[in-house]
Amino acid sequence: ILEAEADTITDFVSGNDLLDLVSISGDNLGTYVEANGAANDFAAYTANATTSFSGNAIDIYVEYNLNGAGNTYFIADEDKSGNVSAGDTLIILSGLSSADAIDSSDII
């Protein structure tokens, strides 16, 4: 998956908005991992996401403030491959740079 192919959300509000993956995939969600990405570029982000994916469920990996640019990156292993790949969903939450930018309860 390429960074340029990501969907971008500019007005996401944690606690008010939801990312609905279950109705799209018809499957249950797996683990949710969140980390500070201030020191990471996109390659490091995807490597960290792959490390966190089990390959058995739709696992989710989030890094806030990726590369210190003030955006939160969200990826879901929708194809359950255990790797970041073209079958996954990548979303950039623009302007959200802190740990409270998104919570696991925002994902259904």
Ranges and model annotations:
Residues 1-108:
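Acidic glycine/aspartate-rich repeat arrays in secreted/surface proteins
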